[in-house]
Every structure is written in structure tokens, then in C-alpha cells.
Amino acid sequence: MKTSAFFIAVLLILSCSSSMIMGVSYHENRCHDWVDCAIWCKQWVPQPKCINRVCDCKPKSLPTNDEIPKSASSSSKN
């Protein structure tokens, strides 16, 4: 009985420590607003989003050539 309790305790400790070593924490990316996400993302994202209390660290996608107005293009024909 003591050995099985000891074995379960060892497995519990190993599972917790392995997730800490690998940097996996399921509660760190929880957020209330974009300020919490700015701390969690650790990269420069102008205003990361907090969607369903989970941080979205992806930067906004750049506009494609079709989305850029013709007046904003710098190409000129001579």
C-alpha cells in the first residue's frame, strides 16, 4: 500500500515538473483585456486580442496588393 501511494506521488511530481520544464502552463495565456496579452505575448504586437479569455498573439496580416488603393501605390509610368 505504501509503495503504490509513493509511486502515485512520484508520478504526480514528475508530471507537474515536466510541464514546468517545458514551459507549458495552461493558465498563463488567460486574459481579461489586451494589456494582459501584451505581457503574455512577449513580442511586439500593437494590440494583441483577448478572445474568449485566451490571448491571440498573432500580428495583423499585411494587406495584399488587391486591398491597397491605386493612389497609394508608388509605381509611376513615364
Curated annotation (Swiss-Prot):
Cysteines engaged in disulfide bonds, as pairs: 31-50, 37-55, 41-57
GO cellular component: extracellular region
Biological processes, Gene Ontology terms: defense response to fungus; killing of cells of another organism
Compartment(s) of residence: Secreted
UniProt entry tagged with the keyword Transmembrane helix: no
Source species, domain of life: Eukaryota
Keywords: Antimicrobial, Disulfide bond, Fungicide, Plant defense, Secreted, Signal
Signal peptide: 1-19
Similarity-based family: Belongs to the DEFL family.
Name of the molecule in the record: Defensin-like protein 308
Gene source species: Arabidopsis thaliana
